Design a protein with these regions (language model features):
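Flexible loop residues that form catalytic
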Residues: 5, 28, 109, 173, ...
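N-terminal capping/small domains of soluble enzymes
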Residues: 1-77, 83-84, 258
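C-terminal helical cap(s) of enzyme catalytic domains, especially alpha/beta-barrels
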Residues: 20, 35-45, 179-193, 235, ...
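Alpha/beta enzyme core
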Residues: 17, 22, 84-220, 226-239, ...
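Glycine/Thr-rich phosphate-binding loops of Rossmann-like dinucleotide-binding domains
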Residues: 10-11, 33, 114, 178, ...
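Extended, intrinsically disordered, low-complexity segments
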Residues: 201, 260-299
Length: 299
């Protein structure tokens, strides 16, 4: 499935949307926002930096103009919500809990204005607070999108599970920065931004593994996935599904190629259900006790 913010309805020209597991739409906030100052995107070696700021025209516009076209393909639609406060998250989830929506992805990796701008998902306590508030306002499945910038991702994932999340999405972009040596200015208008693409894949893969070890709810892997081989790695690490982001900017047909590659891998390896791959990484038993304790306890 696409990662939120990396997909638009125009992709129907490049691939069969009915073959995707879900359509995840760009995050919407309950109030209008202009987004961050330009430049908002900068290419880096092995990836890209972005500081978009999640521009939004508000929920009314989103529900009236953005959401309806995505419901025409028979593929489950996942609405991603973003907010500045716990109350705004609760308000947003209540409004998007519609029959045409299959699940709600809460982008809790965004800044929490009630905690000096620290992302909700940076700490277990703020994670639990916001996910609990969201859970109380909807009967829809709730996916909590985490940040790789957390120092204890396993504890954050457990807080999501304890608060009632149905899945965790691991994860968003890694905070980064680049500078133009000619102008000596940051390449992004907001100075720092999220690093995505192949450069962050080993980080994201490690965190998916840690989340899988820490919780019983499904883990959705995201971060640097550009091929079927990448997707298989994430599933072996513990992901039950994957999201594709930056790769689709380079090749709009990337997700179609990944689906085809997964089909071929399953045929070649006599795999009846792709879920057989989830968590099937082979760890040396002599290393497992010490290493897995570390992996489960640390972030």
């Amino acid at each position: 499935m696409p990662a939120s913010g990396c997909f638009a309805i125009e992709y129907r020209e490049a691939l069969d949307l009915a073959r995707l597991g879900a359509l995840v739409i760009k995050s919407v906030s309950p109030k209008s926002r202009a987004g961050n100052p330009t430049p908002r995107v900068a290419e880096t070696r092995g990836g890209m930096l972005n500081s978009i700021g999640i521009p939004s025209k508000g929920l009314d516009h989103y529900l009236r103009e953005i959401l309806p076209p995505y419901t025409a393909f028979g593929t489950p639609v996942v609405v991603s919500i973003s907010a500045d406060t716990v109350d705004e998250f609760a308000e947003a989830v209540a409004q998007v809990s519609l029959p045409c929506v299959a699940a709600i992805e809460a982008n809790i990796s965004c800044p929490n204005l009630e905690a000096d701008g620290m992302a909700f998902a940076m700490a277990p306590d703020t994670t639990y607070e916001v996910v609990s508030a969201i859970r109380r306002r909807t009967q829809h499945p709730v996916w909590a999108k985490l940040t790789p910038n957390s120092s204890d991702i396993a504890a954050v994932a457990r807080a999501c599970e304890d608060a009632g999340a149905d899945a965790v999405v691991m994860g968003n972009a890694v905070l980064g920065m680049s500078i133009d040596i000619r102008t000596r200015k940051p390449t992004l208008g907001n100075v720092m931004g999220g690093l995505s693409g192949p450069a962050i894949k080993p980080i994201a893969l490690r965190m998916v593994y840690q989340c899988h070890r820490a919780v019983r709810i499904p883990v959705i892997g995201c971060g640097g996935i550009a091929s079927a081989e990448d997707a298989i790695e994430f599933m072996l690490a513990g992901a039950q599904a994957v999201q594709v982001g930056t790769a689709s900017f380079i090749d709009p047909g990337a997700m179609a190629h990944i689906v085809e590659g997964l089909d071929a891998y399953c045929v070649e390896n006599s795999i009846e259900y792709i879920t057989e791959l989830t968590g099937a990484v082979r760890i040396d038993p002599q290393l497992s006790d010490r290493w897995l304790r570390f992996a489960q306890q640390s972030g």
